[in-house]
């Protein structure tokens, strides 16, 4: 299947509208309801220092990359049953691709 090439600006709009209530992306950003996402790519689930993850997130044991995020963002509660993330997901592949493109640029 593969992750569609995303548009960073469209992804930023999605992040602001759907994610920023609970997440930050900048280096040293505070955890909110959800963890700060800086350094997300290449990190295992449940590993942002200082955030209280559910056992389900800690036990999932996958590494975040384009493919794992693409699947997770479609339906987070299906991908990690027991996660406390209340977001229902992004059903449209192009929206997930846009968001992933933004996250890749914003969380380095």
From Swiss-Prot:
PTM section of the record: Binds 1 heme c group covalently per subunit.
Q: Which InterPro entries has this protein been placed in?
A: Cyt_c-like_dom (IPR009056), Cyt_c-like_dom_sf (IPR036909), Cyt_c_1A/1B (IPR002327)
Q: Which Gene3D superfamilies match?
A: Cytochrome c-like domain
Tell me the residue numbers annotated for binding heme c. 19, 22-23, 85
Q: Where in the cell is it found?
A: Mitochondrion intermembrane space
Which top-rank group of organisms is this from?
A: Eukaryota
- Keywords of this protein's UniProt record, alphabetized? Electron transport, Heme, Iron, Metal-binding, Mitochondrion, Respiratory chain, Transport
Principal location listed in the UniProt entry: mitochondrion
A molecular function (GO) held by this record is: metal ion binding
GO annotations of cellular component type: mitochondrial intermembrane space
Q: What does the UniProt function comment say about this protein? A: Electron carrier protein. The oxidized form of the cytochrome c heme group can accept an electron from the heme group of the cytochrome c1 subunit of cytochrome reductase. Cytochrome c then transfers this electron to the cytochrome oxidase complex, the final protein carrier in the mitochondrial electron-transport chain.
Q: Which family does it belong to?
A: Belongs to the cytochrome c family.
Protein name, UniProt field: Cytochrome c
């Amino acid at each position: 299947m593969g992750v569609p090439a995303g548009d960073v600006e469209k992804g930023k709009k999605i992040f602001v509208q759907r994610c920023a209530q609970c997440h930050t992306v900048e280096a040293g950003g505070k955890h909110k309801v959800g963890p700060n996402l800086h350094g997300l790519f290449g990190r295992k689930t449940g590993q942002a220092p200082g955030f209280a993850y559910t056992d389900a997130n800690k036990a999932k044991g996958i590494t975040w990359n384009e493919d794992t995020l693409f699947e997770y963002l479609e339906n987070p509660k299906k991908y990690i049953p027991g996660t406390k993330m209340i977001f229902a997901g992004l059903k449209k592949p192009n929206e997930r691709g846009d968001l992933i493109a933004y996250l890749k640029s914003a969380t380095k």
